[in-house]
Amino acid sequence: SAGQNAKRSIVEGVTNGDVIVIEARDVPDAGTVGDIYALRAFHLGAVGIITDGALRDTEAIAELGKPVYHRASHGSTWGRRHMPFSHDEPITCAGVFVEPGDVIVGDTDGAVVIPHAIAAEVAAEAEAQEHREAFAIERVRAGESPQGIFPLSEERRPDYEAWSK
């Protein structure tokens, strides 16, 4: 079918480092991707899959060991409610605007989209925040209260700066 061919074309176009983001209009009762297409996408270099819809074969996909975020699991095929018609275009997934080239960062708590135009700035601030948090964690492990350390107060900034050297 036309939809199946479009889906194949999209998956076969995956390149190293791609995150597949699927706008499924929050529909939870039709799988957007199953284990075979997920396996193929990861083999081609995809580093994650995100959909605001459902996945099929979620146990098998989880065993692939790659980051996958989805609203639901459902055994029915995507053709029941979805028809892929384009790729590499701006979409809205789970209410978030996503453009090709945006940076997507995820962990066990979820995923965030960073617009490509500000990705370098956000990365620099995130690195600085991680450094401040490392200081806070070290101090709290040593028995201190987080007050003034997290978030870092002006009174504790000299301690942080000495620790940073």
Where are these regions (language model features)?
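C-terminal binding/interaction regions
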Residues: 104
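Channel- or pocket-lining gating/hinge segments that regulate access to a cavity or pore
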Residues: 109-112
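Feature captures the catalytic cores and cofactor-binding loops of soluble hydro-lyases/lyases
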Residues: 1-100, 114-147, 151-165
